[in-house]
Each structure stands twice: as C-alpha cells, then as structure tokens.
C-alpha cells in the first residue's frame, strides 16, 4: 500500500507568502503617536494612513470646535490610551497561541504518519492470520463431519473395543458393534416417545453449526453472520441464490439440501404422529368421558337385540349413551352395528377395543361412572364363558374408584350362578340364558301362546315392569290400588320394611310409608294414580280350574341344563306324564350326567323318562319315534354344538323340517286322544284351542339361537313357536334398566310361586256380556288373580295393559285373558 507523506513547510517559509503589510502587521508593534494641536485635537494611528494627522486645506473653512474642560480632555486621553494598550496585549497573546497550536499540529501530523505506517504493517499480518483461521475451520469441519462415518464403517474392526466388551460381558453373545448400536437406537426410539424429536432437533443444530462454520471458512463474513445465514439456508432452501463464489455456493447448496432433508423428516414425524392419533381413535384406544351411561363388556350374537331394546328404553329421554368394550377392532364393531336393521332412536353407541380383564381398559370406558354394566357371555362353551364372566367380575371389584351402578352378568350354567354372586356381592344380578330359554320353552309347551306374551312384556316396545313410590297412595288397600292407575296395572308391592317384592298380594294389604308399587306400563313417565273409578260388583260365573291331564312330551337334543327342565316338568305336569328324550348320548351316560347334575331319577313321581338314542337329523332315526302321539315336541340346541351358533341352528332347522314332513305323512293315523284331553278346558273356537291344534300336528317349539334364523322360521310357519336368544337380550336390557325387575322375572319363571297364565273368558264373564276392564279385574281378584291383558277372538296378538279400562266392551267366550296367578 503506498505511503503518502505530507509536505512539511516551515512557518518562516509560509510567512513569505503573506503580503508585506500583513507581515509587518504581525512583526512590528503598533505604537500610537500623539499630537497636540491648537484646537486640542489629537490624531494617532500606527500604520493606517487614515489615522494620520490631516493637513488643513487653506481653501476649506475652519470648523468650529466646541470648547472642552481640561478634566474631560484628560479623561478622554486616558481612556484612549487604555484601550490601545489592551488591544496590543490581546494581539500579542493571540499570536503566541497561534504559534503554539501550529507547532502542536505539526507534532500530531508526525505521529499520524508513524501510526499509519504501523497500521499498514499490522493489517497485512491480520489478513494472514484470518486466512489461516478460515482454513483451520474449513478442515476441522471436514474432518469432524467425515470422522463419524469412518468410525461407523470400521467400528467392528476396533479390536480393543471388542476385547473390552468381552471382559465386561463375557456371558453375552459376541454381537457386532454396528448391530448393537442400531439396537440401542431402536430401543431408545421405541421406549422414549420424544427421542425422535430430540434427535431431529440435534441434527438441526449440528447442521446449522457445521454449515455456519463451513460458510465462514469459504466467505468473507463473520462467524455470527455465517451462523445466521446457515439457519436461513436450512429454513428456506431458496435463500442461497445470491451467494457469490464457488465455495460459498457449494456450501450453501449443501446446507439447503440438509435443511430440506430435515424438514422432510420433521414432516414425516408430524405425519406419523397424526396418523398414530387418528389410528388410535379409529381403533378405539382413546378414553371415553361419559357418565350415567350403560357399559357393555364383551361381544356376542345377543348384542344386536340388546342394543335395540336399550335404544327403545332410552327413547323417552331423547336417547342415551351405550359404550361397548370388546376384544375386537373398533372398525369391525362399528361395521357390524351398522348392519343391524333398526333405528337407534337418538342413542349413541361408542365402541372401544380392549379387554374387560384389564383395569386400564375398564378405566378407559369410565366404568366408575356407568349406571349399569352388562357382562355378555362369550361364544365359547358354557364353562369357559362362565369362567370368563367370573374373571370380569373380579376385575370390576378391583377398580379402586368403584362403580356406582349395578352389574348384570349373563351366565350359561345355572350351577355357576352362586359363585359369581359370592364374588360380586349384592350389586351383581345374574341372568342365566339357558335357564330362561328352557323355562320359557316349557311354559310355551304347556300354555301355547305364552311366547308372544313374554315377548311383549320383556321388550320395551309395549308394556313392561316398573317400580315406583307413590306417597299419595299410602294407607290404601291393594284392592283399591289395583284400579287407581288409568294407564298401568299394579302387579305387586315392594315392602319397605324388608325390601321384598310381593307379587299378587292379598286385597287387604295396606300400603305403608315407603312401599313401592310394581306395575305394568308403557313407560315410566306415562302413568300416575288417579281417582278411583266406579266398579260394578255383579254376579259372574265361578268356574273351577280344569283338572290336569297327563302329557306326552318329546325332547330332541341334549341341553346343558336339561336336568333343570326335567325338574320344572316334574313340578308342573300331572301324574302319568311321559318325557321322551331322543339324542345321541348313550343311556348309561345320560343317567350319569343327570345324577351328577343333582337329579334323583328315582324320585320322579309325575313324569316317566323314556330314553331313545339316535341322530335327530337322520330321517330313519326320527321315523322310529311315534311323532304323531306327542302333545309337544321341543327341539333343543345341542350342547355339543354350543360353540357354533350357525351349526346349532342348522341342525335344529333340519330336525324341524324332518319332523314336520314325517307328521304330515302320518296324519291319518294320529291318535287324537291326548289332544282332546288337553284342550277340553277351552271352547271349540278358542284361540288356545287353535294353537294347540296347529295344522293338526303336535306343537313344535324350536330353540333357535340366532334371531335372524328365528325370523326366517317364523315367516315360513314351519314351527308353532320359536324361542331365541332375543328373549335373553330383552331380559338383560330390562334388568340393566332396573335391577329389581330381576327378582320379578325369576319368580315368574320359577315352577313355584306366581306365573303368567292364559285363562278362558268363561272364568270371568258370560257370553256377550258388556262390562269394562276394571270390572273384570275386580272379578279376577275373587280367584286371587291379576288380569294384565286380553286377546279378542278376531285379533292376532294379545293386548297388554289396555288404555281405556273404563270403556264398556262386549266380550265373547272365545276371548282369553292374560293373568298373573299363583301356580297350583
């Protein structure tokens, strides 16, 4: 760099350039000259000609000068003298200061020249040092970036690391370090959910730092500026377009490429997280934040009819919430529920995938806030299903928060019911599916038409049982309470003293404070007590119940609880009855199974067991039976096929078709003796008589497990009555809505106590008599019965809980009434 040396001039040389007068003005002191004239005029001037004394012009006229006193002239002279010397002093000082400043400027200029020389030499050294530092940074970045890849490539060849690994863990298998490192990373990413995000953040920081240092090494910007540019290249891949220089452009492109890779990875992680969240929602892994809902644990073929009944029950409140927890995929459950051909009527069904045996899954569906919990039986055999139900009840008891609702457990074997109640306590209500179906089949076999009555009462479409307290009826006797509800029919009383439910109490029972009334009504908000109507107590026929005649019943198949069905028949049938048992179980094994189940065959008084061995789907085996002589034929679901509903229903359907075909060919040879004895208590045109004479054949009752198959059989009219698991679903739904109803159902299903019966009209009225329904209810009380409905001769279905009970109606002897009566 050229050095510019300023030209130095001395003060003396510069003074030569000044004008002569100026030089003299600075070098010669100005001495004032005083001259006194006649006219007391003083003129003085040092160098200025204007201040010299003027020569008077003889031609000019003298100007008169005013006269002054001597003291004034002396004062004026001293003032002028003082001012003159002050000015001279100031000028001398100024000149001296100027000379001092000029000498100081000269010294500063010399020092400036020296400093410039030194700075030029140091800048050359700094440029060299900066160049060296950028080179060091560049090579450091390359080495530290390449070194990890080289170490990873030759990681397995590091013998000392292998030896160290063998010494520290000699028992483990010698695994390559690459695999071990990959395994450690995999475990870290799997165990710690935020490890991927932290790794991405670390990679971003490393890229920014390495890219910034590399950019600093190949450009002339500072470190802080390079780091900022590196971040902008990572965040925006197009911001490197204005880079100048080959090195800067290469580094910028590399940083931008790394930034695109990082952002692509980040988008992948975000997309993966969102996919997992959506997948969790789709698979039903999220938590259910509901309260006062009904929780269903498990999945079975009864779920469809169960949801239908719950939806109908919740219709009056605008719909409720039903949560289903099962070990199935959530999408599959929702797809199967969508296939059900019924309207949910505002009820929301929420499906969650999980196991009822896991407490975490139970908490996920808000088990503590559910108002009712239904435990469905599995599709396994009865013992496995009951064992699983027992484990579910144990899991429910392990919930620390507890549960405010009651639990309804579907059992398959009646013998396992006490064990579940022992584990769960008083809040457990059990519904034994096999027992319910078996008892209903027997009741329908002995009283044709009762199946439709039970479907109306158990289902929520028509009338069902409700229990409620009515303080305004305290002090009333049950005889008056019976006719106090225009839109309901009282059936019993829940005694406040001991909590027992008394069905069909005596007329003189007086309601006490706290007692609740059991009624049959359309809904819980559709009835209320009113004023007592006027009832006419006129004369009516008093007929005795017809005597029982021996029955001949055939069981096709072997059920699990067939011993309980035999006990019920023993209690209900007249002496001399026969029970034919046709199945594939050997005779000796049958007796052993019945004895092991607790049945003492030798103590059977009313029925006689007749054993026949054969296959119910083989025609020649069925032809060996006197099918035309049986009063009722019950086709039971085979115990050996209880794991497969489809196979069981197919077998029952094949047996039904074969029996009907054989009966049709033997029709001319049918002995009508037993049928004549059986229907002697009813008029010739009675509805019950027509049912008992269905197609002039024996009454055939089929047990069909799948409700869809049941609908097909009902439409084809090849069977008189079809009972399926739909009735069990109705019972589960009713007990879930009110657990007290379970005690009512158990008494009505039992062989002792009160039961549903169908009575002919001649028990209560004369032919063509015109009376209201209240009058008939009062007449039935003379027989200790409660009439809950009727079926007119021209109607297809019975009417339960008629609306206008005070309306006069003309009755016929062909009509029948549905009553609750004490079993004989």
Swiss-Prot record:
Question: What organism does this protein naturally occur in?
Answer: Arabidopsis thaliana
Its topology with respect to the membrane? Multi-pass membrane protein
User: Which InterPro entries does the protein's record reference?
Assistant: CASTOR/POLLUX/SYM8-like, CASTOR/POLLUX/SYM8_dom, NAD(P)-bd_dom_sf, RCK_N
Cited SUPFAM superfamilies: NAD(P)-binding Rossmann-fold domains
Q: What is this protein called?
A: Probable ion channel POLLUX
Membrane-crossing segments per the record: 81-101, 135-155, 198-218, 250-270
Per the record, GO CC terms?
nuclear membrane
Enumerate the UniProt keywords alphabetically: Coiled coil, Ion channel, Ion transport, Membrane, Nucleus, Transmembrane, Transmembrane helix, Transport
Q: Where is the composition biased (Low complexity)?
A: 45-54
